[in-house]
Design a protein with these regions (language model features):
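Left-handed beta-helix
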Residues: 1-8, 212-313
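Conserved N-terminal catalytic core of the sugar/cofactor nucleotidyltransferase
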Residues: 1-15, 20-34, 39-136, 140, ...
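Hydrophobic packing residues within well-ordered alpha-helices of enzyme cores
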Residues: 21, 75-76, 195, 217, ...
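Conserved core of the sugar-phosphate nucleotidyltransferase
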Residues: 127-255, 269-272
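A conserved hydrophobic position in a structured secondary element of the catalytic/binding core
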Residues: 67, 119, 190, 212, ...
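Conserved beta-strand scaffold positions in the cores of enzyme catalytic domains, especially
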Residues: 37, 87, 149-151, 274
Length: 313
């Protein structure tokens, strides 16, 4: 009898504060909301855009959205169509590592060997189909090599100082997909000279889009930040019960902020792979300059369609 292949999961990370863009989101929406709950680019919120992308690879019942309780007035209307268990509510925002762990333990309690993709909720992607085809390819790579955890690396368009960079290493051994490379090192906040060299060498921007088996990612987190892992493991029996909310509130009370990129990924770089993303404009919309650059990109793309006869010869 044929065994059905389990559909993957998608976790959308939407618990951040987005303080640097608050003046812009305030002028657009009229209130003090984080950027993921605002229509920063186009007519849809960034969270809505991310949910649309997620639906290309995972059904609604395998999509989780991680939010922070203090943003309830913003996320509740946007997630009204989702079943309550699919909305993972953190009592407070404690950084990306707790958000990732909370969602992973939820999934691992149901299906620890299922594949999971993590998508930030506040990025711009010019072509959903092309971008998510890379996510699907990462899923396929993880099916071929079950201990693989893959990050999508964005082909660098400039020597960006504000992004994290991924230095690729050798191709993944014993693997028939030649474009998957081992991660040699992560670089944060490079100098101008370093960033120019990184771009010349063909290194990648870190998109923070990550794909792997729930159990494998959990094991890497356990290696990197064992105390954080054990704290969440202690409340695992309460997940999915009436006591979950109270247990999570106790856990988060006084819990330190832990950054997933800095505290986890950098510590286990040798165990990760990177898959290059090409033919897509991507921007993390982390500050006003990047938002303006994205607006400019959209305008430049639109001009040939609006005024086809006005292009220079």
């Amino acid at each position: 009898m044929l065994q059905m292949r389990a559909r993957p999961w998608v976790v959308i990370l939407a618990g951040g504060e987005g303080f640097r863009l608050r003046p812009l989101t305030r002028s657009i929406s009229g209130d003090d909301r984080p950027k993921q709950f605002c229509a920063v680019v186009g007519t849809e919120t960034l969270l809505g855009d991310t949910r649309r992308r997620a639906a290309l690879v995972a059904p609604a019942n395998r999509t989780l959205v991680v939010v922070s309780k203090q943003h309830e007035c913003f996320y509740r209307p946007l997630l009204a169509d989702m079943r309550e268990p699919s909305v993972v509510v953190q009592p407070e925002n404690r950084g990306t590592a707790p958000a990732v762990l909370y969602a992973l333990f939820r999934i691992a309690k149901l299906a620890p060997d299922d594949l999971v993709a993590f998508l930030p909720s506040d990025h711009f992607v010019s072509n959903d189909q092309v971008f998510m085809a890379h996510v699907s390819r990462a899923f396929e790579g993880c099916r071929q090599q079950t201990d693989l955890v893959t990050l999508l690396g964005i082909t660098a368009a400039c020597a960006e100082l504000g992004y994290g960079w991924i230095e690729p290493g050798r191709p993944v051994a014993g693997f028939h997909f030649a474009d998957f490379r081992r991660v040699r090192q992560f670089w944060e906040k490079p100098t101008v000279a370093q960033a120019e060299e990184f771009q010349t060498q063909g290194w990648f921007w870190n998109s923070f889009v990550m794909v792997g088996r729930a159990s494998t990612i959990l094991e890497l987190i356990k290696q990197a930040v064992p105390s954080v892992y054990e704290a969440f493991a202690g409340v695992r029996p309460m997940l999915g019960t009436r006591g979950e909310t109270e247990a999570i509130e106790r856990l988060y009370c006084g819990f330190p902020a832990v950054d997933f990129s800095r505290n986890v990924l950098s510590a286990v770089a040798a165990d990760l792979a990177v898959l290059p993303v090409r033919d897509v404009y991507w921007n993390d919309l982390g500050n006003l300059d990047r938002v303006i650059a994205t607006w400019r990109h959209l305008l430049e793309d639109a001009i040939p369609q609006i005024m086809p006869n006005k292009l220079p010869a």
